[in-house]
Amino acid sequence: MAAKDVKFSQDARDRMLRGVDILANAVKVTLGPKGRNVLIERSFGAPRITKDGVTVAKEIQLEDKFENMGAQMLREVASKTNDLAGDGTTTATVLAQSIVREGAKAVAAGMNPMDLKRGIEIAVAAVVKDIEKRAKPVASSAEIAQVGTISSNGDAAIGKMIAQAMQKVGNEGVITVEENKSLTTEVDIVEGMKFDRGYLSPYFVTNAEKMAVEFDDAYVLLHEKKVSGLQSMLPLLEAVVQAGKPLVIIAEDVEGEALATLVVNRLRGGLKVAAVKAPGFGDRRKAMMEDIAILTGGQLISDDLGMKLENVTLKMLGRAKKVVIDKENTTIVGGAGKKADIESRVGQIKAQIEETSSDYDREKLQERLAKLAGGVAVIRVGGATEVEVKEKKDRVEDALNATRAAVQEGIVPGGGVALLRAKKAVGRINNDNADVQAGINIVLKALEAPIRQIAENAGVEGSIVVGKILENKSETFGFDAQTEEYVDMLAKGIVDPAKVVRTALQDAASVSALLVTTEAMVAELPRDAAPAMPGGGGMGGMGGMGF
């Protein structure tokens, strides 16, 4: 085991604080509408330019091991906030830096670190309560667009695009962000349930131009096993013909004779039909078939339930307003399933998402959830260069995460105002223990840090901005750094998701309180360079070779 270097008390805290400051100072320049970019070297390819706090934090590695430990703890704040809320990473870093700095000063002045920690926790709980009380539910598409605009650094086009996508696929729908090959950024929306299985025979095609099967008001038969003969299905097929509606068969497979018979009937025009293989594999296939059954209001014909094809009636079939099948995909739009059944299934899948520990399973469950809940939207980000596309994609992802958070827990006035106004709630707390009170005061000071930083990045003195806002009694009065004016933040559309503000403070306080209570630090000693290899001795002269 390698030898260790150990630092104690003030020496340890000073080193740690230096690391915290280096990382925080690099991250906090990106905060607010007038925040600057950070250029990051890549081991290969062009450097990356970004305004995303967590991206900057993840790239920082310091040479001094003790400073690096402080920086890595702060990086943990940004990562945790990013995982939970998807945005607010720079705010969390600024808050953490302020709490660690003030905490280190208090410990140096002889205060008890554990009491300070308790004070920090009491104050944070009061702020969280205050934020939850002030949060206003997001109702309209315009409000969603505002959140998206602020989180993408004032890009109204991105805000509008996210609002459009959310309106189309619903709050539960899946929205993904991809890079576009062209200059433009666009939204591509797939409504209904789409899965990656196409028609089993091109003879089913109804639209020759698009090479697709297009059925309106169709019946959907869901069969768990293979369909090899049509004898057992004849009564059902006759009933479908009499009803005059098209039929889509989704089964494990439709084999030889059965497929040939369906194709012949389709070509003769007597039966509008198309057959598709069931999506997925194994247990996941069954679950997806059940999803389709619930979406279309039909029943999955399964041996487990003692159901046979010959006993199937029209009532057991699902219904859909439109079914489109091409060579590779099937889309079911407007299923006739009951809303209550669909909601119950969505709840079931959400519970499974919470329980699973596998990322792969979680991804597949989220796909199923999106298909049931309304659809999938893809935002394709374009730009003139690869560097520009990557920078814009970072902002779109932040904006998307922020709008999701806003839908979950509502919005509060942005620009650091919500935290600044929460000072009133913290100011009301009085504790008999002076050290605990000092911990509360540390948070009181930290609540000003984000708004000060936003102002300073805009070239305005932070203290003046804080003073002016606190003088005004309106809860939504704040500083618009973009125009450098004092405005009503909600009326101007400068809002933050309550979840992002709350998570940023909780994560910052959690890690900072641990850093403040650190008394010793242990790191590996740098290994001495291995001794150089000794030089090779001169070779003796070779004797002459006699012939």
UniProtKB/Swiss-Prot annotation:
Keyword Repeat appears in the UniProt entry: no
The keyword Nucleotide-binding is annotated on this UniProt entry: yes
Location (main, coarse): cytoplasm
Subcellular location: Cytoplasm
GO biological process: protein refolding
InterPro entries xref list: Chaperonin_Cpn60_CS, Cpn60/GroEL, Cpn60/GroEL/TCP-1, GroEL-like_apical_dom_sf, GROEL-like_equatorial_sf, TCP-1-like_intermed_sf
PROSITE patterns: CHAPERONINS_CPN60
GO cellular component, one term: cytoplasm
Reactions it catalyzes: ATP + H2O + a folded polypeptide = ADP + phosphate + an unfolded polypeptide
Keywords: ATP-binding, Chaperone, Cytoplasm, Isomerase, Nucleotide-binding
Binding locations of ATP: T30, L31, G32, P33, K51, D87, G88, T89, T90, T91, G415, D496
Pfam families: Cpn60_TCP1 (PF00118)
GO molecular function: ATP binding; ATP-dependent protein folding chaperone; isomerase activity; unfolded protein binding
Enzyme class, UniProt record, top EC level: isomerase
EC number: 5.6.1.7
HAMAP family named among the record's database cross-references: CH60 (MF_00600)
Function: Together with its co-chaperonin GroES, plays an essential role in assisting protein folding. The GroEL-GroES system forms a nano-cage that allows encapsulation of the non-native substrate proteins and provides a physical environment optimized to promote and accelerate protein folding.
The protein's assembly and partners: Forms a cylinder of 14 subunits composed of two heptameric rings stacked back-to-back. Interacts with the co-chaperonin GroES.
PANTHER family found in the cross-reference section: 60 KDA HEAT SHOCK PROTEIN, MITOCHONDRIAL
Similarity section: Belongs to the chaperonin (HSP60) family.
Protein's UniProt name: Chaperonin GroEL 1
Organism: Rhodopseudomonas palustris (strain BisA53)
Gene encoding the protein: groEL1
